[in-house]
């Protein structure tokens, strides 16, 4: 009799536990999600039953994956994704069933940074974006989707966010990050592949806020670092909730908050990228970033503190130390009125040119604008050579401006600039400098770039000196 009662009680408890078992997943694994194509995509969640077996079934191939939860109910596995397409469903069960619907397969890009990455198509107070209205009312593809991670500042890493996936349409597009959307739009137009944007950015944020505590340990004794009270707060509160979500690559638009720290930034930036790649465990995935646009940060120029040209230089030099990277140059779209360039379409397109050429193998064009390579001194002239000129250099009939030249006294004077015969090099001189030793181009807070390659991509600001 006791055995019978015990058996009934045990069965009742088992049924109760099964009924109460609830499987949950981070918000990024939700309806409308977009998974990276042709890979082993990470997927994870929780169940409230320790050691419980969890089964994942994917509708595109009817395959079942089984994984056991650990002692805290956490589980994680990988699922094979096909060539792009959809919509599909993913079914997850541990006794209770959870369905993720309207799943697309395509290309996933992480988009991070500060306000110029965050700025959405409807703009912000005082800043209206060029072409935003046209972009919003023009029929958008539902194959372009974004997952916006809400603002969250934390002292320790979080597991989840309250973000949701959204398809691009006239109702949702105003809240899409503008530069990232124009990137996705161009990729979709050229390749015909669905594109998902995992967006995590906060206006005014420093690079320190996006770095893990561990990655910053080598720099903690730096006097500038000690002044930063925002270290890791956005890495913990936002980025950590999507780390491990399988991506194709990353887009980064940040730096304005660090213009006074170019030397430190040049160390932190490659360190951050290396750390993110380590945490994602996807090797050296593509990392493309925007060089900050010119703006009148200080109205003083060189010699009155570290103007933004030094930060642009730090970003340019990072190309040499960050593997599989590229830089979208923006020297022609800055503003003396606002730190937020109104032309986000070219920002997105220039990100796309990098991805199309360097990641997706599209041939026939140079992916970015001219970058200073070397110089030679011939009498009272300096001849400047560049990478990424494509066929030739040009100035859109404005004339070459904002070149400077200096002699051994290290005093820079406005320089006359001209092309060599083939229009592949720039020759600078000044009647004020008989024996030149150094040259600069657009090395100020605010300029309107005048030097381009023949594809219309602008040259980065630069200096040949290290004074």
Where do the PLM segments sit?
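Cell-envelope and extracellular/periplasmic
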Residues: 22-467
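Sec/Tat signal peptide C-region and signal peptidase I cleavage site
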Residues: 17-21
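Positively charged n-region of N-terminal signal peptides that target proteins for export
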Residues: 1-4
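Bacterial N-terminal signal peptides
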Residues: 7-16
């Amino acid at each position: 009799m006791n055995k019978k009662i015990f058996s009934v009680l045990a069965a009742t408890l088992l049924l109760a536990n099964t009924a109460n078992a609830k499987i949950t997943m981070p918000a990024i694994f939700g309806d409308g999600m977009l998974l990276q194509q042709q890979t082993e995509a990470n997927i994870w969640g929780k169940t409230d039953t320790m050691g419980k077996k969890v089964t994942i079934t994917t509708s595109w191939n009817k395959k079942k994956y089984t994984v056991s939860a650990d002692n805290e109910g956490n589980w994680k596995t990988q699922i094979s994704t096909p060539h792009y397409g959809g919509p599909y469903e993913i079914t997850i069960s541990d006794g209770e069933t959870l369905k993720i619907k309207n799943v697309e397969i395509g290309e996933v890009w992480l988009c991070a940074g500060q306000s110029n990455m965050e700025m959405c198509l409807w703009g912000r107070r005082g800043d209206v974006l060029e072409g935003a209205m046209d972009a919003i009312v023009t029929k958008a593809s539902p194959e372009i989707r974004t997952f916006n991670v809400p603002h969250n500042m934390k002292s320790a890493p979080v597991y989840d966010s309250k973000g949701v996936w959204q398809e691009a349409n006239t109702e949702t597009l105003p809240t899409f990050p503008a530069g990232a959307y124009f990137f996705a739009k161009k990729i979709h137009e050229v390749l015909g592949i669905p594109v998902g944007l995992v967006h995590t950015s906060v206006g005014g944020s420093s690079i320190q806020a996006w770095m893990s505590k561990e990655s910053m340990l080598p720099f903690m004794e730096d006097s500038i670092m000690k002044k930063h009270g925002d270290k890791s707060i956005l890495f913990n509160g936002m980025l950590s909730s999507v780390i491990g979500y399988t991506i194709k690559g990353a887009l980064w638009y940040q730096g304005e908050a660090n213009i006074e720290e170019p030397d430190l930034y040049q160390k932190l930036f490659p360190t951050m990228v290396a750390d993110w790649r380590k945490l994602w465990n996807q090797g050296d995935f593509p990392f493309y970033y925007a060089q900050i646009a010119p703006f009148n940060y200080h109205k003083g120029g060189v010699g009155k503190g570290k103007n933004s040209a030094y930060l642009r230089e730090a970003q340019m030099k990072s190309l040499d130390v960050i593997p599989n990277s590229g830089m979208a140059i923006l020297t022609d779209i800055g503003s003396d009125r606002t730190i937020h360039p109104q032309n986000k379409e070219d920002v997105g397109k220039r990100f796309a040119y990098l991805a199309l050429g360097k990641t997706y193998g599209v041939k026939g064009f140079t992916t970015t604008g001219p970058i200073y390579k070397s110089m030679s001194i011939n009498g009272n002239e300096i001849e400047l050579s560049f990478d990424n000129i494509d066929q030739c250099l040009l100035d859109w009939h404005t004339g070459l401006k904002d070149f400077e030249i200096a002699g051994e006294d290290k005093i820079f004077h406005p320089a006359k600039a001209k092309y060599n015969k083939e229009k592949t090099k720039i020759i600078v001189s000044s009647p004020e400098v008989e024996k030149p030793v150094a040259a600069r181009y657009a090395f100020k807070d605010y300029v309107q770039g005048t030097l381009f390659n023949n594809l219309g991509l602008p040259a980065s600001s630069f200096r040949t000196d290290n004074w």
